[in-house]
Structures are given as C-alpha cells and as structure tokens.
Amino acid sequence: MPLHPPARRPHGHRRNGSEAQTEATTQDTGRLSCPRRVGAAVCPIQGLGHRAARRPRRGVGTTSASRAPRPGALMPATRNRPRFIHYRVQPPRTHVSFKRPKRSRTHQSHTKVPGWTHEKRMGSSVEEGLRPELSQLEQDADNLGEEEAARLPVTSLNGLLMEGDRHPNPGQGPFFYIGGTNGASIISNYCESKGWQRTQDSRCEDYKLKWCEIKCRDNYCSFREGQQLLFQLPNNKLLTTKIGLLSALREHARTLSKARLMPSTQAKVLKMDEFFPETYRLDIRDERQAFFTLFDETQMWICKPTASNQGKGIFLIRSQEEAAALQAKTQSIEDDPIYRKMPFRAPQARVVQRYVQNPLLLDGKKFDVRSYMLIACAMPYMVFFGHGYARLTLSLYNPHSSDLSGHLTNQFMQKKSPLYMLLKDSTVWSMEHLNRYINDKFRKSKGLPRDWVFTTFTKRMQQIMSHCFLAVKSKLECKLGYFDLIGCDFLIDENFKVWLLEMNSNPALHTNCEVLKEVIPGVVMETLDLALETCQKSLHSQKMLPLQSQRRFVLLYNGETTDLWPRLGSSRPPIRLPYANSNHARSTCEISSSSLTSTRVTIADRPAARKSMSSRTAPICASRKSRLSDSGGVSIEESETSVCSGLPEGSRDAAREPSLGPTEEEREEEQRSTSHRGS
C-alpha cells in the first residue's frame, strides 16, 4: 500500500496490525534517509503539527501499569500503522536512537498525551545517575543489527528508572557537598579521609555534610535535623553584620540595665562602651543626625556597609567637607520617592564607627587579631573559642594617609600592593610570635604580666565573645546539626585596651602564607570533629563532656548544664537543673549561687526549637519564677535568664546574662537591622 508523503500523512493514518511491518521511509529530498530507530513510538496527536507527523518511528513503547497493558504490549490498531501507548513513568531520556552520521544520542521526550505528567526537574539526581547507564544502552544499540535493535528490551530501561527513584545518588555514600572555594581542599580532604564521597549537585538532599559560603533558603528547608550537618546558622547575621551586632549589643545593654543585680555582680558585667567603639546607624534618621551634630575634625570616623567583607565599601571621614558630603548623599537618597518604597532601605544600610587612632604597632605597622568563635552544636549550645593569627599591614602606619591599605589589615587589601608576593609572609604572625614580641618590647615598659597574649588578652577575647553570644542566644535559630565558625577581629590600642571591631561569617580559610598553613587546617579539622562528636552525643542523649576531639579550642558555653533544651524526638524537654551535689568543676564563668539574684526561667520562645512542655515541667518553672520575683529579680517568661560575670583566671566556660523581651519599638528596629543579607 503506498505511503502518504510525510508532510501530508493524515493523523489518523494507521497500518493494519495483522500485516507485517515494513520499514518507514522518508520522502524529504532535503534529508538523507535515516537508519531504523529504537525507542518509544509517539502516538500521532492532533495539535502537534506537521513536525510530529514527519517522525515515523518504530520501537517499543511503555504504558502505565494501572491504565495500560504490560510493557511492550501492542494496543488494538486499525489500518496500516501500529499504535503504542506510553507508560506513565518519569519521561526523561527514554528514547535511544541514532543521529546522522552514525552518532548516538538520547532524545528528551516532550510527548503530551492525556494524563501524562511532567514532574521531573532538570538536573535531578535521578537523571544524573542514569547518564552512564543510558550511554551504555546507546552503545549497545549501535552495535546491534536492525533485527536485534528492534527487539531491544525496554524493561531494562524501565527498571533503571525505577532504581534511580530509589537511589537518587550513584555510589554508596555518605556524601558531602562544598559550595565555593574557601577552604574547599581542607574540607574535602577531611571528608574523604572518612570515606565520604563528594557530590557536585547543589540540590542533593542525601548528604552528611554541606558547607556553603553563601546561605540558601533551600538548604534549610530540606535539612534533616539530627541526620545532617549544615554549615552556618540561618540567622547568624545577628552577629556577623554591623547593624545586627550593634542592635544585639544595645538591646543586651538595656536588658542588663533593667536587671536588678547585686553590686558585686553588676561590676563584673561587661559594658558595651568598654570593648565596642562608638557607632551610629545611617539608616535611622535620629542616629544619623546625632552623628553629624557631634562630628568634629579632631576625630576620625570610618564608614562601613553593614553586610560586606574584604574592606569593600569602606571609607574614612576626617574633614567637615567629607561629613557634609555624606550627609547630603544620605539625605538625597532618603528623599528619593523610589527609596521610600523600598522595604528595607538597603542603600542606607551603613554604620559610622569611631576610628581607634592610637593602635598598638608592631614594627611601626598596624595590626589586628583574628580569632574564632565556634558554635559546634545548637541543641544544646556548645560554643568554643579558638586562637587564630595576627594580621599586619605592609606599609607603616600613618593616621593622615588616605590609602586604606595602611588602615585595613585584611589580606584582600594587602594583595593590592605590588610588594605583596615578596612580603606576604610578613603580613601574618602566629600568636606565639606576637606573644614573644610583646614580651620583649612592652612587658617591662608597660608593666604587663608575662605571656600577656595568652593570659590577659586571651581572657578578654573570651569575655567579649561570650557577651556577644549571650546577646543573641535566645534569637538564634537552632536545630541539631547546625554549626558555625565565625571570625572575630580584635584591635589592641597603645594602652593595651582590647576592642572588638567586627564579626564575620564564612571567615577566610585560605593558606597562602606559611603561618596560615599551620593554623587554618587545624581550625577547620577540629571544627568538623567537634561538630560531628557533639551532634552524635546530643542525638544519643549522651553527656557532652569530655570531648575526645577537643584539642586547641576552649569551651566558652555549655548549654547542656545551663539551658532547658529539648532532646530530638522527645515529647517534652528534659528538666535540667544547675549543678547539685556534684563534684564537677563549675563553669568558671558562672557566679556563685549566693551572689545570684536571677536564674534561668524557661525556654518558651527559642526560635526553631521544639516548644512543647509537659505539665511536669510547668510547676518547676513556676517555682523558679516565684523565687526570682521574691528575691527582687526580674521575672522573665519569653527567654532564658542568665547572669554574666567577668571571666576569672583560667576561664573555660561562658558567662550567663539576662535577656529581656524587646519592646515594640525595638522589634521594629530589629526587623530593619536583620533584614539584610549576612556578609
């Protein structure tokens, strides 16, 4: 029976199913004849146009198990052409065919038959895992003859798809994913030493560890609590942005001022102005006007974006002209009608901070110290302090210089110097080197204790870190498996007063200097060791201490003994009382019970934590609140209450401080300050 021309063949044209099948030929003179193809034939459907009608194919189709015959079965057909029905399985790459000239490829099926659902996303783990097997099937099809190719079983491919649904990732796992290049080689070597396999699929949900430089909402939505480790707390911007840290410290200071503490206890609590330079927000009109009112040319100020790092967007304000220019610019932005419609007013998200003009110099160069705060576990909180290194500028310090590389010590700024490659090792000192230098140069002249760096200075950094953590502890989103490593930058002035400059998320983990090659790998590996061990102990309800993986990090805060925290999967949080009749050494940051006038009350509103509390717990909390009110303390219902003293000598654990609920005005301010993306 003569065939219709391909472009004119009617949609309903079919061959009689009882007749022998003949090879389809093409009549298009502009194309060469194509070898016989093997795959799932497409039913001619009205609406697909001439292009669909010009594709005469012969092969084996698939059908749904619930609505169609068994695999490979032919449906009753009429006239000259057999009709095949697709299975309702996932459609990607179900056609194996030939491409001229004799080059195999796979066709993506886009057939839209009634009831067909296209739910598979591009780049899915199933599709990625099937690529090697599909390629092998193509090669096998190339080597087969025409008769053998016509009988190629589709069931093997169908089974392959089903197997891919059961095992989204190839290999045995467990898997880890690293997003970015910061410390990637160190993290990869650590994970591979444990037999883990690296995946390049950022959407992979079957992982043991995910370490990403940039936070992504999807990572936290698909996170499996207690089964996975995820780097960076979701809202760590409360600490790691300039406005977030400033707002947290201010609120904490107001909380402490309202708390009724014993005079001896009040004297031990850190004051914000003792360690944090005077700072104003430019996105709040009253603060902005207050800064421009008090500005004078005798003081230098530094303007910073709230959520940037590497010195980007930073400039100095030293003259009245520079201050006036900044004032005019901020005012013009605020008067812009487009800016008024912006929900978070990002262009104004800056702070101005009083510049420390008398820094301690090392061989005439400005420096600061990078230390680490590790939140190894979030349920319960296990917070550690880790030593880092000193960062120096390449050029001598000149307070009147406009070159930022002489004022900012980070490696990103120093790399801009043409002398960096020759002198880069001189821009980073180990803490041992810094300690020796201060012992030799300043111990006698300044009356410092021996090893001031590892005694007084270290204790002060631990005090400041504990204070900052406690300022945001009740607001951090905590789940078992979250962990974070935060870089803290400290400056020492010529009077040996310690200032906290900023805290940074995703701190630099590059090893381009000899000192960094000694420091950074140890920090990263101990971070991962502690995160793994604390997560496993919390998951199995084991005591945290002692920690076998703790080497150089120092414990600042042990939430196991100070918090009411819920176990994963428990119906109610366990009752955790302070040390009683115990021979354990008390936290060196805790105050004796005789000097405490307030204690912890409840865990009522910790974000992201389980909040169920049984009736057995309520009387205990109520009795604590009653004792607290009777003693003249502050009764707090929405957050845990702790009191922080200064860290005594040999401090190992963190301080506890009270945290009052914010007022309505403070909540609005916090919403503005925390709406920006973390650095």
From Swiss-Prot:
Binding locations of Mg(2+) 2: 502, 504
Compositional bias annotation for Basic residues: 1-15, 96-110
Lipid biosynthesis keyword on record: no
Protein EC: 6.3.2.-
Pfam families for the chain: TTL (PF03133)
Binding site for Mg(2+) 1: 489, 502
Domain of life: Eukaryota
Keyword tRNA processing attached: no
Record domain TTL: where: 172-543
Cofactor(s) listed in the protein's UniProt record: Mg(2+)
Stretches for region Disordered: 1-33, 49-77, 96-124, 605-679
Residues under site feature: Essential for specifying elongation versus initiation step of the polyglycylase activity: 310
InterPro entries in the cross-refs: TTL/TTLL_fam (IPR004344), TTLL10 (IPR027752)
An annotated GO BP: protein polyglycylation
GO CC annotation terms, alphabetical: axoneme; cilium; microtubule; microtubule cytoskeleton
Location of this chain's protein in the cell: Cytoplasm, Cytoskeleton; Cell projection, Cilium; Cytoplasm, Cytoskeleton, Cilium axoneme
Domain notes from UniProt: Gln-310 is the main determinant for regioselectivity, which segregates between initiases and elongases in all tubulin--tyrosine ligase family. A glutamine residue at this position is found in elongases TTLL6, TTLL9, TTLL11, TTLL13, TTLL10 and favors glutamate-chain elongation, whereas an arginine residue is found in initiases TTLL2, TTLL4, TTLL5, TTLL3, TTLL8 and favors initiation.
PANTHER family referenced in this protein's UniProt entry, alphabetically: INACTIVE POLYGLYCYLASE TTLL10
Summary of the function given for this chain in its UniProt record: Polyglycylase which modifies both tubulin and non-tubulin proteins, generating polyglycine side chains of variable lengths on the gamma-carboxyl groups of specific glutamate residues of target proteins. Involved in the elongation step rather than the initiation step of the polyglycylation reaction. Polyglycylates alpha-tubulin and beta-tubulin. Polyglycylates non-tubulin proteins such as nucleosome assembly protein NAP1.
Name the record gives this protein: Protein polyglycylase TTLL10
Organism annotation: Rattus norvegicus (Rat)
Gene: Ttll10
